[in-house]
């Protein structure tokens, strides 16, 4: 009996959720979904490339471009982690969850591939340059 009583005490403190609580939860969910949609849909891979191209003056300063992409991916992982957390807590509808994650996965894969190709191209050109100058 005492275990049962202890269990009951640990249950959700609000026995009857008030209308205000429901209202707050709905507002929080709608606001979060709107923000997530805005954040995700404004960053297509092409927009990221354009943004980084402007920041890094692509051909002349490849290390700046790589830095900008790394910075973007860092922010991107924060958004991704937040999304997963909010989904686990039930703040995302299934529709938003199903729309958001494939898009985020695609951005992540394409951005990483682009970053890898950029670094490999730079390393390859440095090796060629070094070989030519030695011989």
Label the model's feature ranges.
Residues 1-135:
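Amphipathic alpha-helical assembly/interaction segments
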